[in-house]
């Protein structure tokens, strides 16, 4: 009896340990954040929730709470984040990224015979010169967060942001959405690569900042398109995507395809 009681006590402690944790997960592209939650929930057979979503097109770091660990997620709300993204200035979509729903415009890139510019973008019959790195840097400098001053940038109409108690994407699906602006914080940027029409950036931003908004705004300022074709979250607060080892994982079936979610338990 004593051995059985000890075994039951040990089992209860072990189960409590397993079902009270935070996980850092790698979300793959082209599945939803809720698909990630579903796979992890099935793996642990416990309630699971997240500290913030990623767009279906995006990949990278997601923080999940498992079991009693869901109560710890409130401490992660509002943390700064960093991303790597690629903006395509020859593309314009209704979602501001490659996961367009109904509207997609692609503009032709034309090689230049002029010495002062490498190429042009052909848009609505006009030839728009490819912007220089200096032009792009000046624009990004102008929206950096300074002296507690946030900048107003256009919200993507296809977003989960609520307006008048309703998600914006619901009106967007009906063609009724209006472009709204929202205060956003951009702390720092680094230009990783630029070969027109593609611009690759690393961005450090405040919570609630839409990277799609930055890409679209840049394109509008330059008279070009501006849609994300790649987006990866690389950090949330002190948690880094690079800290996740590709060893511990959960598998699940999403729309007939097996997907793998790699994760690491975080110390609370």
Where are these predicted regions, by residue range?
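Catalytic/RNA-binding core of pseudouridine synthases
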Residues: 10-268
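Short, intrinsically disordered low-complexity segments
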Residues: 1-2, 258
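Polybasic, lysine-rich low-complexity intrinsically disordered segments
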Residues: 3-4, 13
């Amino acid at each position: 009896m004593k051995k059985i009681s000890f075994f039951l006590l040990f089992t209860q402690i072990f189960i409590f340990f397993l079902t009270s944790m935070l996980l850092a997960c790698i979300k793959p592209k082209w599945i939803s954040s809720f698909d990630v939650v579903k796979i992890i929930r099935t793996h642990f057979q416990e309630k699971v929730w997240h500290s913030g979503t990623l767009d279906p097109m995006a990949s990278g770091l997601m923080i999940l709470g498992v079991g009693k660990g869901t109560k710890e997620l409130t401490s992660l709300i509002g943390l700064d984040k960093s991303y790597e993204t690629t903006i395509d200035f020859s593309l314009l979509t209704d979602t501001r990224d490659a996961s367009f729903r109904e509207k997609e415009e692609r503009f032709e890139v034309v090689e230049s015979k002029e010495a002062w510019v490498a190429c042009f973008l052909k848009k609505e019959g006009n030839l728009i010169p490819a912007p220089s790195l200096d032009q792009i840097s000046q624009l990004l400098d102008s929206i950096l967060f300074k002296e507690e001053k946030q900048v107003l940038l256009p919200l993507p109409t296809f977003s989960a942001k609520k307006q008048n108690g309703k998600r914006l994407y619901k009106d967007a699906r009906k063609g009724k959405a209006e472009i709204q602006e929202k205060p956003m914080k951009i702390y720092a940027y680094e230009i990783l690569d630029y070969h027109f029409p593609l611009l690759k950036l690393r961005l450090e931003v405040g919570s609630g900042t839409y990277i799609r908004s930055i890409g679209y705004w840049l394109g509008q300022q330059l008279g070009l398109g501006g849609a994300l074709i790649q987006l990866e979250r690389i950090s949330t607060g002190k948690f880094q995507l690079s800290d996740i080892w590709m060893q511990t994982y959960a598998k699940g079936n999403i729309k007939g395809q097996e997907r793998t979610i790699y994760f690491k338990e975080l110390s609370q």
